Amino acid sequence: MYTLMKADVLAQLAGLQQEISQLHDNAQQNQSHFVLLERRFSRLQSFNDEPQLQDYRLQLEHDDAVVKQIAQLRQVANAALCDYEKHQVCALCSPSSKTDDYLTSFNQSLQQEIKLAGMQMGEKVLLVGSGALPTTALVLVAKLGATVFCYDHDPAAQQLARQLVQSLGLEKQVQFIDNLKELTDRPVDHIIVASLVADKQALLAQLVPYVTRSSKLVMRYGNGLKSIFNCPYCHEVNCSHWRTASKPVTTGLYDLIILEPNHHA
């Protein structure tokens, strides 16, 4: 039975990869295809929870062929998602955009993060991997009156995000940095690392200079089948810079864990 299930899963993953790649190409020529692309993203998110996979989940997540196919699909899906977000920003910046609808549609996952990390009104938050569509930043401003620093390695995404923030008149509350060193001498209260940030373990050491002893870091990630649409993360127990401050929490979009600076480092 497992052999048949594995073959079916590999076929589904390969099919999704081909569909997303083709729709991504089409959307770059005709923007109406972004709607179809969004539906495929929803399919990716629901794939992880399909009932027929659950009995074989551990085997699938440790099968080299499945892991390889998931990595290939994630690369294609993430590239498409980045362009989809850029398309959404352009739409949101238009005069006819309904920004309130956009904000209210945000997933409840962030509310869990706010509670788990103990975020308070008016605090400073660094968002790593903010992307072209900085939903998290906008919600933190709306809910907590936070000051959010957005950092992303993609200059085009940063520029589009700036345009969106400017169109909303939130330049003071949502600021953009091109280098983490811009936060020197002004540490943040919290850090949120986006699920699509790839090398999370290496990033942690870079973030230490910009936090206080009481800061919390929210690490978003997805392992196993959930890594189809998220980059994986496994906390190293012997990490000298950070320690876990919560158990892993599962949300509809990704998993998350709260880290805090290791005071003994």
Curated annotation (Swiss-Prot):
Class of enzymatic activity (EC top level): transferase
InterPro entries, A to Z: NAD(P)-bd_dom_sf, Nicotian_synth, SAM-dependent_MTases_sf
Record-level Gene Ontology MF annotations: nicotianamine synthase activity
GO biological process: nicotianamine biosynthetic process
Keywords carried by this UniProt record: S-adenosyl-L-methionine, Transferase
Entry superkingdom: Bacteria
EC number: 2.5.1.-
Reaction(s) catalysed by this chain's protein: L-histidine + S-adenosyl-L-methionine = (2S)-2-amino-4-{[(1S)-1-carboxy-2-(1H-imidazol-4-yl)ethyl]amino}butanoate + S-methyl-5'-thioadenosine + H(+)
Function: Catalyzes the nucleophilic attack of one alpha-aminobutanoate moiety from SAM onto L-histidine to produce the intermediate (2S)-2-amino-4-{[(1S)-1-carboxy-2-(1H-imidazol-4-yl)ethyl]amino}butanoate. Functions in the biosynthesis of the metallophore yersinopine, which is involved in metal acquisition and thus enables bacterial growth inside the host, where metal access is limited. Therefore, this enzyme probably contributes to Yersinia virulence.
Record family assignment: Belongs to the methyltransferase superfamily. CntL family.
Protein name: L-histidine 2-aminobutanoyltransferase
Species in which this protein is naturally found: Yersinia pestis
Gene: smtA3
